[in-house]
């Protein structure tokens, strides 16, 4: 699948493709994830994860939609995945979402296209609820989700601490 993204402030068009994540994406995905580990509250670990931690992404997303977003040269510019929310069959129609866009490519509509792609793939699997778990210290993500149809459905106060800063976890939900 190839998408064309045009920014109103720029004349050029950027081509990129989405395909399921694979072992070939290990280092690139971990590099993008670790950028957010070190520079934001978007990823919760306090220190970079080793490349072997990629196996965790594969394990938690097994049987769920995933996507690696690559530019026309084949370089990874983002990734996303859905994962189990609760392993009980009662919750089989609910999934949690995780996605990260390379910092040089944010604000270009790629995150929205990735979210839409994952939502469409989720519908094909019968998933009707998508949950996002977001740090209260990540207002851009909260705003992004609101703009894309998520509503805040819960907040756990002062449950996280990263780099000495305490934060809430904000739970957002989109019913597809």
Spell out what each predicted region is.
Residues 31-48, 57:
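Helix-loop element at the rim of GNAT/NAT acetyltransferase active sites that forms part
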Residues 84, 131-134, 151-168:
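Conserved catalytic-core motifs of GNAT/GCN5-like acyltransferases
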Residues 99-104, 108, 120, 136-137:
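Active-site acidic-Proline motif in GNAT/NAT acetyltransferases
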Residues 46-104, 115, 175:
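Acetyl-CoA-dependent GNAT
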Residues 132-142:
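Conserved beta-strand-loop-alpha-helix junction that forms the acyl-donor binding cleft
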Residues 15-29:
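A short beta-loop-alpha structural element at the N-terminal edge
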Residues 107-124, 143-147:
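Conserved acetyl-CoA-binding loop-helix of GNAT-fold acetyltransferases
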Residues 122-134:
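Conserved GNAT acetyl-CoA-binding A-motif
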């Amino acid at each position: 699948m190839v998408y064309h993204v045009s920014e109103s402030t720029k004349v050029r068009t950027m081509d990129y493709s989405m395909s399921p994540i694979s072992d070939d994406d290990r280092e690139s995905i971990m590099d993008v994830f670790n950028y957010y580990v070190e520079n934001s509250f978007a990823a919760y670990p306090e220190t970079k994860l080793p490349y072997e931690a990629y196996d965790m992404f594969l394990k938690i997303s097994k049987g769920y939609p995933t996507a690696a977003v690559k530019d026309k040269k084949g370089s990874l510019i983002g990734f996303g995945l859905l994962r189990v929310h609760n392993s009980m069959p009662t919750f089989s129609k609910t999934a949690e979402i995780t996605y990260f866009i390379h910092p040089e490519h944010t604000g270009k509509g790629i995150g929205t296209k990735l979210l839409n792609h994952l939502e469409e793939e989720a519908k094909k699997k019968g998933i009707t609820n998508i949950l996002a778990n977001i740090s209260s210290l990540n207002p851009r993500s909260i705003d992004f989700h609101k703009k894309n149809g998520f509503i805040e459905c819960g907040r756990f106060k002062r449950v996280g601490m990263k780099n000495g800063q305490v934060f809430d976890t904000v739970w957002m939900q989109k019913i597809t």
